[in-house]
């Protein structure tokens, strides 16, 4: 079935160019030439250097945003960047708590370079602490098909084998994303038929290789811009919106038992981006395209966790999909302080409570569990301390916040 006509309307969600931007309209960012003020009752919220949006004034202090960059290779971050973190007082194990609350798992991302750190793996391997793992980089396109038709799975296999040996669920991440593409894909001058075949072959080969091992796949990652328009990448530019259907159908054919997700950030609050994704979900479901879940990445800032997160989870779940928190971290400006750590504890607790309160929210994954290997300092200058454990593997107050969120 052709979906392009239905999807085309979503692509028209463009910034408003007038004297003032209305609610959810763009109001700033590098290269923006439109209005920089908002209509009455709304304020201009800066999300990044590239995008600001008009939001209701009542939400101005509770909305957060982050534009996820390609994950750099993990590096060890020294303790000189932050003050002593304090320590958790909870003795509970987080995956045990999650399952007691009716969730499938509490999990973490990891990366291959970290697995040589025996102190790190001693904690990672505890399946009462983590019941699920996500490979941060080793299943992405540049890692698995660096040359056309030449696949390599050694990195992904290492993490898949770790999940199997520890009795953990494995999340596949990801099949189709605009970033971390090999140049033969991103710079390719393909016809629609050629790129369709390339997507089908990549998704089919990748998902087939891990058939029976993966609980859920992030099949399509980050298809929308923050203003709700479609990202203009090689996939969209060549195939329009149909690339989403092509990828999902290829993944379903390769592993009928794996849950198929679209994974996105900045959908944790109501706005143009969340609306576009919600409309996409409705269109896909109406056309019987296989889609089982929506991943809420949840890269937050201390003190700015959206108060409407639970409502957003519920809204998407009402479309007949499961939902999950897939990449949780809550960063702060360094150095950390007792006040920031206390707020971070509250923030983690509130995110967990939101998932715990929604039956269709199957679990929570942190985007690595220790500040030692967090992606944040390499991506956001002067920020860090985003994880529940500090760089010395000491549990922070945030750990207690997670336990509290699960009802402990």
UniProtKB/Swiss-Prot annotation:
It is found in: Secreted. GO terms for molecular function: cellulose binding; endo-1,4-beta-xylanase activity. Endo-1,4-beta-xylanase involved in the hydrolysis of xylan, a major structural heterogeneous polysaccharide found in plant biomass representing the second most abundant polysaccharide in the biosphere, after cellulose. It comes from Phanerodontia chrysosporium. This is Endo-1,4-beta-xylanase A. Keywords: Carbohydrate metabolism, Disulfide bond, Glycosidase, Hydrolase, Polysaccharide degradation, Secreted, Signal, Xylan degradation. One of its GO terms (cellular component) is extracellular region. Residues 88-405 form the GH10 domain. Pfam families: CBM_1, Glyco_hydro_10. The lineage of its organism: Eukaryota, Fungi, Dikarya, Basidiomycota, Agaricomycotina.
